[in-house]
Amino acid sequence: MSSHFPLTFRISPLIRITLISLYFSLTLPLPFLADITSASVPPLMLWTGIVMGFIVLVGALSERVIVDEDTIKVTYPSWIPSFFRKGWSLPWSKIKDLKSRTTGQGGLVYYFVSLDAQTAFLLPMRIAGFSRLVNIVTEKTGIDTTDIRPLSQPWMYLVLLVLTSFLMIVDGWTIATAIGMGR
C-alpha cells in the first residue's frame, strides 16, 4: 500500500452534519418557548447558552487524526483549551497491541497499548476513511486488524439525520406558533 504522508483524517461529514443538526433541533425552540411562557430563564440567556454549546460541539467535532511515517496523533485546533480535549501522539514503534473493550451500549472500541503497557490510547473510530487508517495501522505495526469495524455504521447516522429532519419540521411549527402567540 502506497501512502503519501502525512495524512489527515477528520470526523466523518455525515456524523458532523447529523450531530450539529440534532443539537439545533433540540435547542432552537427553547428561547421562543421561554419568551411566550414567561419562563424564569430569559431568552437572551438561552441564546447565549446555545451559541456557547455550538462552539463546544464544533470543537469536539474538530478532532483530527494525523499519521506520518513515524507517528499517529490525535489533535484539535489551537482554540480548544487542552483541559477540554487533549490530543495524544504515539510513535508506531511504541505500539504493542490493539485491545478491544465493550462499551456500555454493547459496541466495541479499541485502544492502542504502548510497549510500557502503562498507557492506552483510543483508536478514533468516527473518522472518514476509517478503513484506510486501519490499513495503515496494520502496515506500520504488523497488528492484525481484520476484525476491526467502525463503532457505528453510516446507516445509523442516516436514520438519526432523517428523524432529526422530522424534529426540525416540528421545531418550525413550534417556533412559528410561539412567534404568532407573542404578537
Q: Could you tell me what each predicted segment is?
A:
Residues 93-98:
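Structured surface patches comprising rigid loops and adjacent beta-strands/short helices at the edges
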Residues 50-91:
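Conserved beta-hairpin
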Residues 28-32, 57, 171-175:
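Hydrophobic membrane-targeting signal helices
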Residues 70, 77-79, 100-103, 125-126:
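Surface loops and adjacent helix of pleckstrin homology
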Residues 1-38, 118-120, 132-168:
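N-terminal membrane-targeting/pre-transmembrane regions
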Residues 38-46:
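Short, aromatic-rich membrane-interface segments at the entry and exit
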Residues 102, 106-136:
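Canonical phosphoinositide-binding patch of PH/PH-like domains
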Residues 168-183:
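Juxtamembrane boundary at the C-terminal end of a transmembrane helix
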